[in-house]
UniProtKB/Swiss-Prot annotation:
Organism of provenance: Burkholderia cenocepacia (strain HI2424)
This protein's record includes keyword Kinase: no
Family of this protein: Belongs to the DapB family.
Predominant location category: cytoplasm
Name of this chain's protein: 4-hydroxy-tetrahydrodipicolinate reductase
Length: 265
C-alpha cells in the first residue's frame, strides 16, 4: 500500500507517519505540508530519528503521482485541494478532517463518484462502537430523558462542537426518528426558558492537551445514564486510518465511513 500523509508536520500527521512506517504492508511515499512550513525539505521520519528518504513538500502533484492512498487529517480548505489532486491522479482518500461546510461536503460526495473515499470525523474503533451503543440507548430512553452531549478537546482545536460530537448527535437523533438540524441546541446563555424535551444539547470545552473526551448524557427523573468515550492518544485514530486504507484496497469508487470499514452497518 503506497501511502502519502497530509499535514505531515502536525501532531496527527506524525502519528500517521509512525503508524505507516511500523506497518509491514504499508510504504510511505509522500508527506505533504502547507506552503511556507518551516519543516519543508525535512525527512518525514526526522522526528523519530529515522531516515525515510521521503521529504516534506507542498508539491501536491509530485506526491499524488507516487501514491495510491492519501490519509488527510488537516483543515477543510486543504482537504478540498487534496480532493482535486486525488481526482487528477486517481488516488483513494481517507479523510478525518472536520469542520466542512455543507457545500464542501457536497463536493466531497461528488468526488466519491470517481474515487474511493472513507470519510469519518473519528476513526477509532471505540468511538464507532460507541455510536452503535448510543443508537440502542436512544431507542430505550426516548421518553422522559433529556439528552445532552458534552465534549472536550485541546486548546488548539478550531471547530466546535467536534465532528465526533456531531456524529454522536446524528446517531441519537436518527435512532429517535429526528433530524439533528431541527433539534440541536448549541450552547446556552442568558434566560433560555425551559428545556425543549425534544432537543439535543451540545456543550464544548477547550483547554490544555485533551485529545478528545465525549459524553452523551441521558438525564431522567431519579436517574441519569452517561455513555463516555475518552481518547488518551491519537494512536487509535492512526490505526483506524490504516484499517480504512485496507478497506479501500478492495473497493472501487464510493463514499464510505468507519461503520462500513468495521462492518457495523
Amino acid at each position: 500500500m503506497k501511502i502519502a500523509i497530509a499535514g505531515a508536520s502536525g501532531r496527527m500527521g506524525r502519528m500517521l507517519i509512525e503508524a505507516v512506517l511500523n506497518d509491514a504492508d504499508a510504504q510511505l511515499v509522500g508527506a505533504l505540508d502547507r506552503a511556507g512550513s518551516p519543516f519543508l525539505g525535512q525527512d518525514a521520519g526526522a522526528f523519530l530519528g529515522k531516515d525515510t528518504g521521503v521529504k516534506l513538500t507542498d508539491d501536491l502533484d509530485a506526491v499524488f503521482a507516487q501514491a495510491e492512498y492519501l490519509i488527510d487529517f488537516t483543515r477543510p480548505e486543504g482537504t478540498m485541494a487534496h480532493i482535486e489532486a486525488a481526482l487528477r491522479h486517481d488516488v483513494k482518500l481517507v479523510i478525518g478532517t472536520t469542520g466542512f461546510t455543507a457545500e464542501q461536503k457536497a463536493d466531497l460526495q461528488a468526488a466519491a463518484a470517481r474515487i474511493g473515499i472513507v470519510f469519518a470525523a473519528n476513526m477509532s474503533v471505540g468511538v464507532n462502537v460507541t455510536l452503535k451503543l448510543l443508537e440502542f440507548a436512544a431507542q430505550h430512553f426516548s421518553h422522559g430523558y433529556d439528552i445532552e452531549i458534552i465534549e472536550a478537546h485541546h486548546r488548539h482545536k478550531v471547530d466546535a462542537p467536534s465532528g465526533t460530537a456531531l456524529m454522536m448527535g446524528e446517531a441519537v437523533a436518527g435512532a429517535l426518528g429526528r433530524s439533528l438540524d431541527d433539534c440541536a441546541v448549541y450552547g446556552r446563555h442568558g434566560v433560555t426558558g425551559e428545556r425543549d424535551p425534544s432537543s439535543i444539547g451540545f456543550a464544548a470545552v477547550r483547554g490544555g492537551d485533551i485529545v478528545g473526551d465525549h459524553t452523551v448524557l441521558f438525564a431522567g427523573i431519579g436517574e441519569r445514564i452517561e455513555i463516555t468515550h475518552k481518547s488518551s492518544s491519537r494512536v487509535s485514530y492512526a490505526q483506524g486510518a490504516l484499517r480504512a486504507v485496507r478497506f479501500l484496497s478492495a473497493r472501487g469508487a464510493g463514499l464510505f465511513d468507519m461503520q462500513d470499514v468495521l462492518g457495523l452497518r
